[in-house]
Amino acid sequence: MKLSRRSFMKANAVAAVAAAAGLSVPGVARAVVGQQEAIKWDKAPCRFCGTGCGVLVGTQQGRVVACQGDPDAPVNRGLNCIKGYFLPKIMYGKDRLTQPLLRMKNGKYDKEGEFTLITWDQAFDVMEEKFKTALKEKGPESIGMFGSGQWTIWEGYAASKLFKAGFRSNNIDPNARHCMASAVVGFMRTFGMDEPMGCYDDIEQADAFVLWGANMAEMHPILWSRITNRRLSNQNVTVAVLSTYQHRSFELADNGIIFTPQSDLVILNYIANYIIQNNAINQDFFSKHVNLRKGATDIGYGLRPTHPLEKAAKNPGSDASEPMSFEDYKAFVAEYTLEKTAEMTGVPKDQLEQLAQLYADPNKKVISYWTMGFNQHTRGVWANNLVYNLHLLTGKISQPGCGPFSLTGQPSACGTAREVGTFAHRLPADMVVTNEKHRDICEKKWNIPSGTIPAKIGLHAVAQDRALKDGKLNVYWTMCTNNMQAGPNINEERMPGWRDPRNFIIVSDPYPTVSALAADLILPTAMWVEKEGAYGNAERRTQFWRQQVQAPGEAKSDLWQLVQFSRRFKTEEVWPEDLLAKKPELRGKTLYEVLYATPEVSKFPVSELAEDQLNDESRELGFYLQKGLFEEYAWFGRGHGHDLAPFDDYHKARGLRWPVVNGKETQWRYSEGNDPYVKAGEGYKFYGKPDGKAVIFALPFEPAAEAPDEEYDLWLSTGRVLEHWHTGSMTRRVPELHRAFPEAVLFIHPLDAKARDLRRGDKVKVVSRRGEVISIVETRGRNRPPQGLVYMPFFDAAQLVNKLTQDATDPLSKETDFKKCAVKLEKV
C-alpha cells in the first residue's frame, strides 16, 4: 500500500513520544501505519485529564485499534501525552466486566455471598426492592449516589434529575468534590460565577507562569509542552514553581520554591503586602472593580462534630464575611513581612522577593496555575481567594496572557460536575438547591410539582461515608469512580459503611476495581467511545463525540442504566400526596415518563442520526435522547453568562468555549471587547456579583489539621505520576504503562531514609493514626521530597495509601486534604 508523508509523520510521532517516555508502542504504530486504509477515524476528546486534548480514534471491525493526536484540535494541536497514545488499550483489559454480578448465597442476595452472574432484569429487581424499601421506611435521605467528573454531560444531568427531582434526594455528589470543590467555592466567593475567565491561548502571550501546587509536567503534560515552548523560545519569560517537594516541573523553573506544608497561605498574603508596600496596585482597576471583605476565621477542619478540633473551633464551617476598608486590609497583610514569611515557610528571602516581583511588575503578564496542591487543602477555598487577590490588586486578569487559572484533573469535572450541577448543593448553571427561586426555575422547566426539589443540601462525599458507617444512608450507587481507593480514611470511615449489613452498595464500572469488589452489586459499564458523549474541559471548552464502537457483552452506559432504572418507579411511590395533588396529571406515570420521555426531551427524532451512526440508547428508545437532554440542560445557562451553542454545532467543531453568543465563543470573560456580557464603556464587569465587582478577601494563615509530632514524625503527601491516571483502573490495564511504573513507591529524602536504616528498594511500613501500608523506599527518581516529608502516589490498588489519610476537609468546600497528614516509618 502507499503511505502518505503525513501518515508516515503521524506514525513516527507516536513512536517518538513513546521512546521519550521509555516505552514501546508496536501495536499502535502498526495500527497507524500498516492498516491506514482499513481504519475509520473520528474525533473525540481524550478520556483522561481535564486538559481536553482532541484525539482521532481509529476503529476497525467493531474495535478501537488506534489513536493519534488530532492536528485540528486547538488544545493539543496533534500531540498526545503518553497516556493518550495508549487510549485503545484501556478498553480491552482481560478482566473487562460484561455482565451484572450480585453477591449471592443459596440462590439469593447475601451480603456475605460470592459474586454471581445475573441478568440486567435481575439486577434492577434487586435495586428496585432496595430503593423502594429505603424510601418507604426512612425517606429520601436514606439513599444516595456518588458520581463523577468523568460522566458525560448528559449522564450527569440525567443522574441529577433522577435523584433531585425523581427521588427527591440531594444526596448526590461527584468525585470532583475531592478535587475541584475548593476551586468552585473560591470562584463563587470572589466572582459570583464558577470557572476560569481565561483560556489556554494565554500561554503563548504570558510573560510569567506561577505554579501553585501543580506538577504540570506530569499531570498536564500537553499544556506543559506549550509552556516549555514559550519559556525556551523567549528569554524574558519566567517560570516559578511552588510545592512542598521537588518534582519534574522544577526542571524548567527559574524560581523553584519548596515551602512547609500549609504555609502557602503565608506566601500569598506576603505577596499582597509586597504589592501594596511597593505601590504596585493598579489603582484604576482596583477602585472601579473591587470590593474588600474580611472573612470569618477559626472555621474548623470538616471533621466529625465530636472531633476535638471541631469542638475547639470558634466558627466551624462559617462562610461569613464583612466589608472592610483598604486601610484595614493594608494593616491585615502588613503582618506578613518578608522576615516572618521566610521563617514560617522555610523559603529563602530572595526567592520570595523574586516571586512577589513578578506580580508587582506592571509590565509582566502573569498566569497563576494551580491544581490539587491548592484545592486538596483544609483552607483550599482561602488559597483560591488569596491568589485571586494578587490578580485583582494588580489588574492582571481577564486579558490575554494574564489571569488566575484553576486546572482540572478530570475530563468533565467542569462540564458535568460543575456546570450541570451534580454536587449535593448545586443545580444547573451555578444555581443552588438552597435558593427558592433557583428550585422554582428547575421545577417549572422540568414540569414537576413546586416543592419537589428539597431545599436542604445533601450529603457531600465525606459525609456520605460517615452516613453509611452510621447506618443513615442505606442504598448507595456509585458510577464512573473508584472511591474506595481514591477517598480518604478507608479503614475508619468508608469500608465499615460499605460492608455494613444495613446498607446495599451498587457500583457501575467497566472493571473490577477496589470499589467494585467491596460492593454488593456490580453493573458492567460502557466506556468512552462506546457511547455518545460530551465533556467540558478546564478552559470552558465543551466537546462532543459520537459512539464509535459497541460495548462488549452486556455492558451498558451510565445513561442507559439511569434512564432504564427510572422505569421501575411511579410518581406515587416516590412523591408524597401533597406534591401529586399539585400536578395530578403526573399520577400513575413512571419517572422515566416524567423526567426523560417528556415532550421537551423526546422531541428530537432518532432519524436525525445517520443510518450507519451508532447510538444504542437513542435507537432503543426511539428518540435522540442525548440531544434532548442537552438542549433542555443548555436552556438554563443561555442568557445568563453560561451560554452553550446548539447541540449540532458541537459535532462539527473541535469544541467551543462558553459563553457562546451568536455563534462566537468567548476566550476571556469579564472584560470589554472579549466578553459579550460586558458592554462598551464598562471596561470590566464581574457580572456574577450584583454590583459587578469582584471581592478581595482578608484571610489569615491557619495550621493544618494534623502535623508531625514526636511519634508520627513525617508529613505525608499523596498524588499521581505521569504514567497512571488516578487509581490506575484504566492505565494499569495497559501493559506498556504498567511496565513503566508497575507499583507505587515511597519517595523519601536520602537522609531521612538513612536515619531510619532504610535503603533504596527496601520494604517499609508506613503508619498513620488511621492505618498502615507496605511500600518500597525510593530515594532517587523524579520526586525529591525535602527532609521531613514523604510522597506516595495513589494509583496502586495493592498499596492503598488512603488507609493513611485523614478525612479532614475544607469546611467551606468539603474537599478533602490529601496532601497533609502525619506518618511514621517502620522497616519491614
Curated annotation (Swiss-Prot):
GO terms for molecular function: 4 iron, 4 sulfur cluster binding; electron transfer activity; iron ion binding; molybdenum ion binding; molybdopterin cofactor binding; nitrate reductase (cytochrome) activity. Substrate binds at F794. It is found in: Periplasm. Binds 1 [4Fe-4S] cluster. PROSITE patterns: 4FE4S_MOW_BIS_MGD, MOLYBDOPTERIN_PROK_1, TAT. It catalyses: 2 Fe(II)-[cytochrome] + nitrate + 2 H(+) = 2 Fe(III)-[cytochrome] + nitrite + H2O. Its cofactor is [4Fe-4S] cluster; Mo-bis(molybdopterin guanine dinucleotide). One of its GO terms (cellular component) is membrane. Its main location: periplasm. Its EC number is 1.9.6.1. GO terms for biological process: cellular respiration; Mo-molybdopterin cofactor biosynthetic process; nitrate assimilation. Mo-bis(molybdopterin guanine dinucleotide) binds at residues 83, 150, 175, 179, 212-219, 243-247, 262-264, 372, 376, 482, 508-509, 531, 558, 718-727, 802, 819. Coiled coil: none annotated. Residues 39-95 form the 4Fe-4S Mo/W bis-MGD-type domain. Residues 1-31 form the signal peptide. [4Fe-4S] cluster binds at C46, C49, C53, C81. Keywords: 4Fe-4S, Electron transport, Iron, Iron-sulfur, Metal-binding, Molybdenum, Nitrate assimilation, Oxidoreductase, Periplasm, Signal, Transport. It comes from the Bacteria. Predicted to be exported by the Tat system. The position of the signal peptide cleavage has not been experimentally proven. Belongs to the prokaryotic molybdopterin-containing oxidoreductase family. NasA/NapA/NarB subfamily. Catalytic subunit of the periplasmic nitrate reductase complex NapAB. Receives electrons from NapB and catalyzes the reduction of nitrate to nitrite. PANTHER family: PERIPLASMIC NITRATE REDUCTASE, RESPIRATORY NITRATE REDUCTASE. Component of the periplasmic nitrate reductase NapAB complex composed of NapA and NapB. This is Periplasmic nitrate reductase. The gene is napA.
